[in-house]
Amino acid sequence: DLLSSHTEVWGKATLTDTGFTLVGKADRVDVLHDGTARIYDYKTGPLPSVAQQLHFDKQLLLEAEILQRGGFDSLNVLQVAEATYIGVGNELKLAKAPLGEDEVWVKFSELIKSYQNPNQGYTARRAMLMVDVPSDYDQLARYGEWGTNEHPLLIKT
C-alpha cells in the first residue's frame, strides 16, 4: 500500500485569524496508494504516552494538522492515516499519536492568540510534565531565582 516515502519534509500552515505561520519538518512521511499519509518521528529517548502527547508533546499532532491543511506542498496529500513515534534505542518501540482525540489546531490557535496580546507575559515553565524535574532551559531562564508559583511579570521596553 506504499506509494512513496519522503524524509525530512518541510511543511507549514498559517492560522488565518492571526497570520501566524507554523513551520515544521517531518522526519518521514509515507504516501499510500489510497491517497492518505503516515507520518513518522524518530526518537532516541523515551516515547511520549498518549496523555503526554495530548498535554505536552504535540509535535506529531501538529504535523498531522499541517498535512491536513495542505502544508506539505510536495506531497499533495490531505488526509493522515496514522502518525507514529518510532523509538530507535536498544529495541524498536512504537507509539501512535492520538489523532482526532483533541482539538489540537483550535487549542494551538488560542495559545498563539494569547501570546500575541501585548499584556500577556511569557513564562519559561508554562506546561511542565513534572515541576521538580529540571528543564533543558532552566539555566537560560534563570530558574531558581524565581518560583513556579509566581506569575510572569510584563516589563515593557
Give the ranges of each region predicted by the language model.
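RecB-family 4Fe-4S metal-dependent nuclease core
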Residues: 1-157
